[in-house]
Amino acid sequence: MAKAKKTVKPVKSPTTPRSVKAVKDAKGAISPASVLPRIGVRTAEALVEGELGYLCAEPEIVIGDLDGPVGTALATLVGNQVAGHTKVFAILNSDAQVKPATLMVSKVTVTSSRYTNILMGTVQAGIAHGVLDSVRQGIIPKALANSIGIIYSVWLDPEVLKVSPGKVDHEALFAVHREATVKVIKKAMGHEPSIDWLLENQDKVEHYFHECGKQGQF
């Protein structure tokens, strides 16, 4: 006589998905209240310049869900440190990492301790405040602060090293990077510039350094 097959019921996970906000009802049972939006992968570049040559910020970012390719890339970068291009999180100060998690990657190969101190001091602080400004202004929904991440390619002009210690305008440098951070995040979250704008202005916008090259400056 053949034995009846035993039906195995799937075991439900005690945890709720990343994208679901859990709340307790009157009996204490957990139920999904709302599904948070996923943003996929978004990118942007921005430029903000100050009055002095070294007061220039040109971030390029990739922003997306931590449980997707952006999260994988971010974690890989943290674990794959390279001499001269150390990756660090944006922080208000030691022991106070900002949210969304923002990983800074230097575009410049760092060889100077003074450059490091400026990059991981004034510039890092400016970026950290810019990220929080973006949340405060509603550019990044507060509800997504723990579920998305930012990979932030940061530019600090090496010309800053030609300025004597004590003569660098750290307040202005902080402000430039703070403003650039808000600007680049706003562009990424808003898919700016739009494809319509790009097609309309393709022949009206000329790359600055291409123009310099045509003028014989390089």
Regions found by a protein language model. Give the residues of each.
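Accessory interaction regions appended to the cores of large information-processing enzymes
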Residues: 2-218
